[in-house]
Amino acid sequence: MNRKKDVILRATVALTENYKKEELFMPKNNRELPSRAAVIDVVKELRSVIFPGYFWNDSAAKVFPEYFAEYRLNDLYDRLKEQIEIALLYAQPELEQEGAEEEADRICAGFFEQLPEVQQRLLKDVQAGFDGDPAAKSKEEIISSYPGLFAIYVYRLAHLLYKEEVPYIPRIMTEYAHGKTGIDINPGATIGDYFFIDHGTGVVIGETTEIGRNVKLYQGVTLGALSTRQGQQLANVKRHPTIRDNVTIYSNASVLGGETVVGENTIIGGNTFITESVPANTKVSAKSPELVIKKSRSAVSKTDVWDWQD
């Protein structure tokens, strides 16, 4: 027996034993989990319905938008309903097929009824981005290229399903956006209108975070929970901060804890660490470290070795 066959055989036997010992490796009750690929496809294609002039190459979308929207929504309704039904059946073993189908249809109907409202809220988010970023040349640029808007778009869809307690799918959606943008918004967070994330990489918004209107976050901001060993005991407890209206939080600031409230019209400076409430109309900043600036002894050439010693 050659080395490859021997190694594969041993690995197969060991893996199979692990499958038998731990049920987590296999779906329960001979039922499927929702398809991550199918859920992501729905997210991608709904974007073409929300912003048809940007993410759909068919010229008919511009000439006959009503027919385009109806055609796409019919197809997407069925595909999302199928995944919701699968998720419900997996999470609730006692649920019968007929009951799951009826509940999935109810949830899906409510989701699609709210799409026009989501579209209007996203336009407000676009406006917030345009007002908040002098580098933005147009609103079209924001819609077509800004990662912050994409993460917010996915969150606003996922949040609708989260409120209906749909298992698995909301998190699949937002983790897709997380992987694409580096922005981690839990679908359970509550976020008001005119929300803008500038740059975005490293932003974290926890499940029980509440964010008001006209809030702007920069890269690396964490709206998180204080570390605890209680784990699942805190699953339904508010663990993340509340951010009131008209707040700006600069890069790499951390605002932590369920009892922490940042009041209206407040500015949180970069690299701050906040675990207690901040009153309205306040500026918070960390004391700057002392900079040491030395004049070099002579002009530096490209071949010089830098010496940071005295």
Question: Positions of the model-derived regions?
Answer:
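Structural signal for interior beta-strand "rungs" in well-ordered beta-sheet cores
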Residues: 177-296
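Terminal amphipathic alpha-helical/low-complexity segments used for targeting or macromolecular assembly
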Residues: 1-175, 298-310
